[in-house]
A protein has these predicted regions:
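C-terminal structural segments of small proteins and small subunits
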Residues: 102, 109-131
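Ribosome large-subunit tunnel/peptidyl-transferase-proximal elements
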Residues: 1-103, 113, 131-143
């Protein structure tokens, strides 16, 4: 008996929408990362990009558990001497909640070309509206 491997040509991608309102940011990111990788599929193949498209709405209403809203710090470096910038999670959620969600999902994807291509299928929106109604996305509920 041989192992059946998924071919890229036989792949069909679905669209899923996740509502992040009132849900923990990390738990939403885990679910999105698994959908982007395709780990929910029966014919998941680790070396093939077999994931689906994911839309996350209401990223501004996602919550942090514990004291992370005050304690968590996001860092970025400009490359210049003394160019280390830091932003607290509270400020990040007020200004760029979609970017905070993107960083969380990006950290849960593989650090190679499969992760990069999976991240291109992630669509984040601060409000409840999204322009992907023509793709007929299915609602995915968190456990």
């Amino acid at each position: 008996m041989s192992t059946t491997l998924l071919k890229k040509e036989a792949l069909e991608r679905k669209w899923y929408v996740i509502d992040a309102a009132g849900k923990p940011l990390g738990r939403t990111a885990v679910t999105a990362a698994n959908l982007l990788r395709g780990k929910h599929k029966v014919d998941f193949t680790p070396n093939v990009d077999c994931g689906d498209n994911v839309i996350i709405i209401n990223t501004d209403k996602a919550v942090f558990t514990g004291n992370k809203l005050e304690d968590k710090t996001y860092y970025r470096v400009s490359g210049w001497i003394g160019g280390l910038k830091e932003t607290k999670a509270r400020v990040m959620m007020e200004k760029r909640s979609d970017y905070a969600m993107e960083l969380a999902v990006k950290g849960m994807l593989p650090k190679n070309t499969l992760g990069k291509s999976a991240l291109t299928r992630l669509h984040l929106y601060k409000g409840a509206e999204h322009p992907h109604a023509a793709q007929k996305p299915e609602a995915w509920t968190l456990d």
